């Protein structure tokens, strides 16, 4: 299961990975969250995203090919239960009985 190909990065993420250092250089001491925020602003303002969209499309094609190969070699698919695992729900807590209820039950036991 660990050999399953990872999903490809979006055009934005590909661009952000390449632009991250220059954003940090322009804004020394900037927080990671602020880098992402500034990156989002720059990405929205960018006019020509075709270079990054083409890279993302190629990455998606490579991913689709790798997934087909993975499944052809016996890898599990989502239909076979290979989807995301759900967390186990915590066990429900049993309500504690009040002292009065406990003494009432004790009385019932004694009468039998």
UniProtKB/Swiss-Prot annotation:
Q: Give residues where Phosphotyrosine occurs.
A: 12
User: Which residues in this protein are found as Phosphoserine?
Assistant: 10, 103, 111
Which Pfam family name is an example for this entry? HMG_box
Taxonomically, the superkingdom here is Eukaryota
User: Which keywords label this protein?
Assistant: Chromosome, DNA-binding, Nucleus, Phosphoprotein
Q: Which GO terms describe its cellular component?
A: chromatin; nucleus
The protein's matches in InterPro entries, at most eight in alphabetical order, are given as: HMG_box_dom (IPR009071), HMG_box_dom_sf (IPR036910), HMGB (IPR050342)
- Biased region (Basic residues) positions are 84-98
Where is this chain's protein located in or outside the cell?
A: Nucleus; Chromosome
Q: Where is this region: Disordered?
A: 72-112
Compositionally biased intervals (Acidic residues): 103-112
Q: Which GO terms describe its biological process?
A: chromatin organization; regulation of transcription by RNA polymerase II
Spell out the Gene3D superfamilies in the cross-references. Answer: High mobility group box domain
Q: What is the protein's known function? A: Binds preferentially single-stranded DNA and unwinds double-stranded DNA. Prefers sites containing the sequence 5'-ttg-3'. Facilitates DNA bending. Associated with early embryonic chromatin in the absence of histone H1.
* Family to which the UniProt record says this protein belongs: Belongs to the HMGB family.
Protein name in the entry: High mobility group protein D
Q: Which gene encodes it?
A: HmgD
């Amino acid at each position: 299961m660990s050999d399953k190909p990872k999903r490809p990065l979006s055009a934005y993420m590909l661009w952000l990975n390449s632009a991250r250092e220059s954003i940090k250089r322009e804004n020394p001491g900037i927080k990671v969250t602020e880098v992402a925020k500034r990156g989002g602003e720059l990405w929205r303002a960018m006019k020509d995203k075709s270079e990054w969209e083409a890279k993302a499309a190629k990455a998606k094609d490579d991913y689709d090919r790798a997934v087909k190969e993975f499944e052809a070699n016996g890898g599990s698919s989502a239909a076979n239960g290979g989807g995301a695992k759900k967390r186990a729900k915590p066990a429900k807590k049993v309500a504690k009985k009040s002292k009065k209820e406990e003494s009432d039950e004790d009385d019932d036991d004694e009468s039998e």
